[in-house]
């Protein structure tokens, strides 16, 4: 898809709030060996397999657990290190042999968990069994790569595990390199398991039990996570940073102040206005990278009135104040996903823009055709954990929808509860972001549009036509049938934009601000920080 030019707005100077000095906990150590990260919200669970684990929880799992394989790096679109979705490297495995319908992994013989327990093939199998059995997000994530049954994971010997393929699927091997198929200390977790909690979810929620480069030594939910380097890690060169302190600082003004006076080393969820101003100041390093396979969107619950009516959904799509959001909320730091030319052909790509633009007259006409000439009342919800973007989007949308008679009450959901509330699939109208870990169009649509109704099909959208296109693309990709694959990708994109159960707004950027003496940032599919490569000069 061709890149698009976007508006760069003139910025008004903003007052910076005073902020507390919060690096005192690290003064006893060399500042070069300790990194302070500040963000708006933090993890609600240390276990990627846990119920309702939020996005910040992904960062904990990524840095504290190993997987059998990972990705090589390449140079990204902005010249920075960027994961290579097509190239894999060994992580916990020392060797991978690919067969026609299986992959066999030899484990590193000297690999141990953070408590010194040797890692065996039994730990790998138990961990993968857990992922496909525990339910919810992790189980659906594994299924996206056709990994669905414990019988697919076979212990060959203490040092060898085999993964049997359910079918040919190009997503299977990439799916083993995402966060979910991490390896846990099975014997330790089993000791904490109960009849009601056979997978030890309660224990792993509070404790890291992996072999990754870092381990959590303390966690106060909503306040702070402290990591220490795992000196027993053998997955690569020893990380240069010994200690990571991750503080939750809700005020964006305070986070900016901490960066500007040098107390904090990294922040990655400041308002876009701040990132633009900080980049202009030149005192910090600012890195902006488009989300891979990701969009911010307005979602509608299509199983219940009034959003079960396609004309209502189209009316909302015409009423969204797209350009105002780009200008006033994002300050140009995003790729628009709206306003494609009326004669534009659908591309074999995702994300790609739809053809809707703000047109209040069209929206009013569609509301009348749908039987709602006077509108209706509803709520629009957002995740408070990312309020800096979500709240102004909802306010601007509320104002614009009022012009077509839709009166919205804004529902602010605490970040720790957001995933749980969203997964109930009862929110009528909401904004959210989704970024597919595997950078393939069909992967995004499996999660967000397929009638299997994954947790990320937050609209409860059902379409046999869309399902047929998605399933066809998966099969065609596995068989190398390029022509059918392209036809099916175009088909499910067209169907999604005709039915419009969710309205793409833009492809977000990951914006990271860091001190000039911090190096080693790399972009990953999960959009979170990888501590292994970070360093301080």
Q: Locations of the language-model features?
A:
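Periplasmic-binding protein-like
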Residues: 47-50, 172-176, 274-277, 287, ...
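Structural transition elements
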Residues: 214, 335-369, 386-392, 480
